[in-house]
Amino acid sequence: MRTMLTCVARSALRQTSMSAPARACFSASAPALSSRSRNYSKQQQQQPVARTGLKDLHPLPESMREQLESSDTPQEPYTASGNSNDPAVHSSRPASQPAEPEVSPRVAAPGLVNGSSSKNGSPSSASSNGASSSGASSSGTYSSGNASIPISNISEAWGTSFAGLGERSFSKEAIDVLMAPINEADVEIKPDGLIYLPEIKYRRILNKAFGPGGWGMAPRSETNVGQGIVSREWVLICQGRFVATARGEQEFFKPSGVPTASEGAKSNALMRCCKDLGVSSELWDPRFIRQFRKKHCIEVWAQDTAGKKKKLWRRKDDPPFEYPWKETGTA
């Protein structure tokens, strides 16, 4: 009996000793597993994400990269990403004119002195006492050899200058070309009855009077883009002298038409400037307009594809209106 009780007691003690370490093991392992998962999640959050840098997208030569990385701030003419840092690249304004001419006026325009030639066809010579052989003197003249030529018409800031305005008239040959009667065969009429001279005709008259390169147009203001209209002020320069200024206008119907409208505004300004030279001045004479319409033009009824009728003007020697208009009779 005693032996049986001893065996039962030993088995009970053995089971108790085995269950205690097991409970301790399980209780100790549970928090260890949870802390390991928390540490793993923190490491996952703190791990940096790989991104593509600007240096990989825009590789630069090693010499340029070392130069840019060595300095604290980007140097000209490139930033650290390889983009240009020059203000002239990002500006639409033309570069400023040089303070002094780089080419001698005698080489660029032989025989011309401030826009006109002397009677014998040679440039007027100036006294060479104290004048250097090259460079600009303090009196505003450019010396080359034994001749001193004014440079006021070479480096003028035509955005604000009025140099040569009303100084003297042009030569008789130029005046005869500018003031010649208008050739009625060159005059066109719009469907609304407005008569005009094509812009290329004005350029041909100026080329005939002053020669190619003897005149030009310079912008007087920035391009003004409004609601469906572009305008800009231009100045007409002939033989290095200010002649006239006018603001040209041109309509446009969509944003992609702004560049073309800018060119149209320049042509419109040229036409208005030519009024001061007397070119085709008859186009602003009401009596000439009435006589020209009666002699060379005809007003007709025209019908569009929708059946709407409208009065339109055309020259008598022009063919009838085409699609989408169809002439139905004389008005």
Curated annotation (Swiss-Prot):
Disulfide bridge partners, by residue number: none
Biased composition (Low complexity): 114-143
Gene Ontology CC annotations of this record: mitochondrial chromosome; mitochondrial nucleoid
Location of region: Disordered: 32-143, 312-331
Localization (cell): Mitochondrion matrix, Mitochondrion nucleoid
Any one GO BP annotation for this protein: interstrand cross-link repair
GO MF term set: DNA binding; single-stranded DNA binding
Main location: mitochondrion
Protein's job: Performs an essential function in the repair of oxidatively damaged mtDNA that is required for the maintenance of the mitochondrial genome. Binds to DNA.
Protein's recorded name: Mitochondrial genome maintenance protein MGM101
Organism of origin: Mycosarcoma maydis
